[in-house]
């Protein structure tokens, strides 16, 4: 790493800084007043005692990321648990169960609730305990703090206060947000790693103010005192506004002097800093907001099912209470032995209405088993297992980066199987974000003969098309190379050369893919405009914020740059002979080599001002003074921004440069324009004075003042040229897009790149293809910002949308494909309320949608429009900080762990290392998780309806007595133990088809998108199946057992024998039903299903052997009453078969007469080549993929249609000529 010299002797006269980062002191200037709210923080440096009383008492440095503490855990956690309707119902039921009205023992209601809620609370507690232990570890870290008289002592982080002077040493984390005062380097710079903040691994350089450089050792802080007035705490990591008041002077502060908590000091021995923000006031803690809470569609539907069952529960409870009131009034007087006349009795026939109301409470408790109490906790367990399978899938592990897939939340697993629209970023997502400098335009001449991947792919396609038409001759591939660019809207000549003088093969260089001998090895000196080329190279080498690092093995410098583009520019400058090798606070140093002779000249450029690149400015400017004393302004930025700032005499190369930029964009390259101007001393001094005033202001208008100041100097530029770097497609992107298209998914691309670049990347990854009609919606240029001009532009866009919608709707060719392309400026109008639904209507009818030049906010707005306008599940995928908004807005957010940092990953629900892994995440895991959760929930409701309604039938059968036919311990174990494990196995291990089949038949994914397994017809079907099973279980058992000689001594079965027999049938029916539901068995499923049945027999055997004081009427019920009775075993077999018979009949009917796709595939897989019905093979081959108009497969289909058309036309012509020959006299 390039470093400044370690301190030996300070030479302040040689120390300067970037003007925008370290302006000169303003003599005699008073501190600026605090301007309004948001800028009220005052920090007394080295005087922490000043901050112990209000209003200057700020937060401590103790941080806690836990959700609970010892006092709040139980109330807050219980509140979270009883937000769920089912848990709230069971809480009320458990409370009522302690009263005499309850038909159950109170523990049969309380124990399951305590178990389920306790399990969930235990999970919350464990997660919070992990967070607490992490907090303890962080708060106990130690750092050196100035106590007094120049003495520093170790102190825990949590005891660091605002105003403390802190000394941080190499590889230590910063304990709070600090203002950098000095460092071990004489020029006051330090290197900081911010991976914990933004995930970026490249080091950032920080620079102290010049005035604080003498504070270079412990003793220097003995009498140090200063005041900081700055902004209030806020979450913006990249801004800071404030002033330092020191020695009666005011110095402006900005982000380059701020060291943020949780970033690490690297490659610097030590730094001194003063604490500005502590604890939750630090920027990292201000950013620790939670991602928006997301719930899957299945979970939301599940709530409605719960409400439906609650309505059913209330309905049958009302029926039961009405029946009881009837019985009380008309039949109870005859039952004298019940002593119904007592006033306190609930069965008093004098007041049947009161008796019915009281019985309603009993009925609500009795039928509560219709609501599955263990549903929520079972789903949580299953989703955690599913997420672990996603995390451990080796097919989604990236060998190059060593990064696996990561399910950051388990709440949305099943939502992965219902995605309708994917909205993707381009750079770093579809492309690698590893830039190669490929071409450039200098002084109106284009350099660089190497073709981009997009050009090669396009030229190959065009060569094939032209060869078919006989327009070019075949040339051996080994002797051809394609030059020039390709335009999708017009046909160009393809130049084929076997040899050329522009290129000499060389070893690959990272970031530099340029090939053109005209600029290499000093050959540029022989070009027609060598001075302009020299200026171009110097802009590349000087206009940046990178840090050089010497590679000792190669002897070359590599660069820690803020973006891959910047690193590629520096690599290009180095290869052209202009090597950036050193940076200090005041200067950059360049080694210039003008020819192949090896002569090297080292030059120093004093950096006077640096106006950094932002997404709003879209440009970067450096003002330097060269060794001759000339002040130069060097600027690079988006072509649209640079061109509008050109001087009249600076447009000499505007025409050819514009043409080259268009060609580069069509080749899929990222472009920037380069310009410069010379400044005289007076002009610079006047501007710098005004700019410093803007820098020292504190207030909400500071950014506006700075922008105005930058505009004052960034004008009258002279255009020198443009750069073109290639951002290659990631591995497997075209194949992944093709597979997703075959699965029926729609893909939108949202990018900040220009339209030409986005279009050609679209062609490269098969989102666009030849023959696809491109609908480009653009806004016409309008001067001024008046309401009238905006109205005209809006009407023009609306007119374009209307015409496009009509064109698409009137298209009769079923194979016609449309692509919608719109830029950010136009999108601003298209997203307004009165136009957005017309835009959406057009977009959903197009095969692909590409939005260019869009801002991060527009990305999020587009996602919101698609999500709310279509009502379908949306997935947003990106890799950068500018993608966070759309990732959080989408139903599912997927982050890619790329070189742009980890902000997208930290905001996402799932993260993957490469876009290509999205195919497996959705088509395999999404499909599996959707079907597992859907079947699991349906089965839960089936078994609880089947069980709960038997209580209602028995209630009616016994005169609405409010009596349960089952022992309380049976009820206790039913949901929690005896039927819970098999359903968890279903949710975790079920596979209707294997992963290979999912990828081979991607159209299976549409089962989730169409919600085939969790629509209301499927849900009601399972409910009806549960109702049928309950009828069979109750009435068949009653019919078999009631009034029959059950025991060998002629005794009939009592209530407990009937209840135990019915419960046995329920356990068998429920577990056999889930066995029939499963398509994929492992030994785990067998153990859990048949083990649950065995567990029932084991329980009842042990329980019935206990003394009567514990077992009550169940004493010896299995070995003495049920087991010896053949009718018990016959009833179990008969009832179980009858209960599952309709499901077996339904499946048989469906598989034979109306099979679903996975049924056919299962038979194909099972029978292999012995399958007799060849129609099934043909059917599944044609249905293996959804009909799509994008992707490589769509290209192939279009080509096949084209060939068939030509063949049919040829055959038609031959038939015509044959008929003419037959009719000719010669043939006669």
Curated annotation (Swiss-Prot):
Primary localization class, coarse: membrane
Organism: Arabidopsis thaliana (Mouse-ear cress)
Keyword Phosphoprotein: no
Signal peptide stretch: none
Cytoplasmic membrane side: 1-74, 124-305, 378-934, 989-1018, 1078-1083, 1147-1228
Subcellular location: Membrane
Record field: catalytic activity: ATP + H2O + phospholipidSide 1 = ADP + phosphate + phospholipidSide 2
Keywords: ATP-binding, Isopeptide bond, Magnesium, Membrane, Metal-binding, Nucleotide-binding, Translocase, Transmembrane, Transmembrane helix, Ubl conjugation
Active site: 425
Chain's role: Involved in transport of phospholipids.
Transmembrane segments: 75-96, 101-123, 306-327, 360-377, 935-954, 969-988, 1019-1041, 1055-1077, 1084-1104, 1118-1146
InterPro entries: ATPase_P-typ_cyto_dom_N (IPR023299), ATPase_P-typ_P_site (IPR018303), ATPase_P-typ_TM_dom_sf (IPR023298), ATPase_P-typ_transduc_dom_A_sf (IPR008250), HAD-like_sf (IPR036412), HAD_sf (IPR023214), P-type_ATPase_IV (IPR006539), P-type_ATPase_N (IPR032631)
Chain ranges on the Extracellular side, renumbered to this chain: 97-100, 328-359, 955-968, 1042-1054, 1105-1117
The UniProt record lists the keyword Membrane: yes
Topology of the protein relative to the lipid bilayer: Multi-pass membrane protein
EC number per UniProt: 7.6.2.1
The name this protein goes by in its record: Probable phospholipid-transporting ATPase 5
